[in-house]
Structure formats: structure tokens, C-alpha cells
């Protein structure tokens, strides 16, 4: 769905080659689209973990971002009607987008706990943070401000406690919204 981008397998092969050459790599899993769910994230994170110990940078799609319309157009041209419908809902309803983005952030962090040596650094959008309050806003702000743990940085590489799921496995995030 990314116009002019190399296929995912080509990107993965390039990352694998770099990793094998001893170059520290990170993966941008950004942006993720609303039809993506737990199984999709598990598959992606499995590929990324196969590269070794990597940092995955994650951000749900933002309907205000420049690439949103490109993705919508690409989905329409590819005939992905279910994706088009979902993206339209994300674009048309602020509350729908907030709930979708929170669910995506939470699901990715939950799935990431299944993989040793895989750090996911989430990027909640400023508008998402502003659209929340209380404990949830505090948690999202902490996630935003956490330093990503790339091993080539001068900071220790332990996973940041701020970069964790919003709710535990099987627990709904509805009580936080």
C-alpha cells in the first residue's frame, strides 16, 4: 500500500544483511492500519525478531498525516474494499480513530511480550494524547517521552517501563477511554 516502496521481503532481506554484517538495525512498523490485528502483528514481529535483537518503532496510522490519503488511494486502486471502509471510518470519526489507535498501541505491546529480545517503542500521536485524560493521558505521555532503546545509543538498552501495554492480555482498554 506504499506507492513506490520496495516490497516487504526486499526490506527484510536488506535488514537481515545489515544485521549479519554486525550493523545495529531498527524497524519502523509505522504506520499500522486499522484492519491489522493480533495475528498480523504476531507475524510481523516474528519476522523482526528473526533478525536478532531489534527495536521496533510503532505508530498507528494518523488520519491527519500526509501519507493517509496516499494509503487510502492505494487501497482503493488495489480493490481492498474492507481496508478502504475501515480507513474511511478512521478519517470520518475522531472517536473511532482514538479507540482504534489505542487498541493498536495496546495490541502491539501485548504481542511484543511474547518475544524475548524484542523491544517495541510506541509513538502515540500528540492529538491522541490530547484526546485522552487522567491515567491514560499520563501513560501515553510517558510512552511519548520514553527514549527508544537502540543498542547503539549511549543509554542502557533495558526496555523502558513506559513502553508497555495499556491493559494486560485479555483486558479491555474500554475502562481507560
Annotate the PLM regions.
Residues 1-100:
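Conserved AdoMet/S-adenosylmethionine-binding subsite of the radical SAM
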Residues 71-177:
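C-terminal accessory extensions appended to soluble enzyme cores
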Amino acid at each position: 500500500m506504499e506507492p513506490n516502496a520496495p516490497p516487504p521481503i526486499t526490506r527484510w532481506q536488506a535488514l537481515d544483511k545489515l544485521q549479519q554484517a554486525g550493523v545495529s538495525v531498527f524497524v519502523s512498523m509505522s504506520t499500522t492500519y486499522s484492519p491489522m490485528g493480533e495475528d498480523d502483528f504476531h507475524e510481523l514481529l516474528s519476522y523482526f525478531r528473526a533478525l536478532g535483537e531489534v527495536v521496533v518503532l510503532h505508530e498507528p496510522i494518523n488520519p491527519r498525516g500526509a501519507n493517509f490519503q496516499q494509503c487510502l488511494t492505494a487501497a482503493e486502486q488495489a480493490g481492498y474494499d474492507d481496508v478502504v471502509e475501515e480507513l474511511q471510518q478512521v478519517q470520518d470519526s475522531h472517536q473511532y480513530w482514538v479507540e482504534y489507535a489505542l487498541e493498536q498501541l495496546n495490541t502491539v505491546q501485548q504481542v511484543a511480550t511474547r518475544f524475548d529480545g524484542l523491544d517495541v517503542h510506541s509513538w502515540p500521536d500528540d492529538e491522541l494524547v490530547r484526546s485522552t485524560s487522567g491515567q491514560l493521558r499520563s501513560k501515553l505521555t510517558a510512552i511519548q517521552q520514553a527514549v527508544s532503546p537502540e543498542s547503539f545509543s549511549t543509554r542502557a538498552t533495558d526496555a523502558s517501563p513506559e513502553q508497555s501495554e495499556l491493559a494486560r492480555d485479555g483486558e479491555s482498554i474500554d475502562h481507560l477511554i
